[in-house]
Amino acid sequence: MTRWRLDIAYDGANFSGWATQPDRRTVQGELETWIPRVLRLDQPTPLTVAGRTDAGVHARGQVAHVDLPDNVDTSAMLRRLSRVLTPDIVVTSVRPVPSTFDARFSALWRRYVYRLWDESSRPDPVTRFHVAPVRGHLDLDCLNTAGTSLLGLRDFAAFCKHREGATTIRTLLDCHAERLDDPCGTVEVTVRADAFCHSMVRSLVGALTAVASGRRSQDWLDNVAASTSRASSVLVMPACGLTLEEVGYPSDEDLARRAAQARSRRSHNDICDTCWGTDEPIQPRRPFPHPLLHHPRGTHPHPHYHRQRLG
């Protein structure tokens, strides 16, 4: 058997997330159904993925690995998958990797982009189901200052949905926003970390946009970030604006070491003031109705729109 890396892109609108669920359409479910069929295998082909995206979240740079027979014809595999998979999911490449490669644990970082329209934007009806509205005008200098204050190794419990036994300690490597030079004036918030907790990116963006729109202060964000439990005041942004863009990996020689490091559960003992980028310890609504996204409950064409927690 050989380990193969799959690079995958999908529009998450009509998927109940990545992970297989009974009686739900998921990305993992579709791929694990069709891969053995197109390869004419009589055994299952379980996939391990870099990021288990939630319902409605998109991906351009998702990565998974799977163990398959040595003689797989990758060109034929890609061609057959393109015929049987629906247009909202594409396997963009398949290539052999060392047996030490683990799509989840070997990853150095994941990069997500959240796309927004504020009141300074001109919404585009063609892309409206991949961009989320936010109330007010966003001061991007303020947003970037707030994002910088969160960088480093820390407990992101305030921004994560609790999962029993899971750590919420992460290293945030990059968090910045820019307004695109496009007709819409779309705002892109880039968030990159070694790993993410459940709903962490959408919660971070919700908190940052609250500060950037003037509805919350930097002191509020500092107090939220210092909390060791979920903050109810933080808005979880809709899934439709979020896309997994890229996953970074080390060289082949460092794959095993990185996987072992990632499997080690981190604790608060790993967190120090210097990691947080400061010499001093940190002391402890609903969106506006958007003309293109306003539909009576149950009539919105985006299947997951009304499932999002909006406040």
Spans of features found by a protein language model:
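Structured-RNA-binding interfaces characteristic of tRNA pseudouridine synthases
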Residues: 1-277, 288
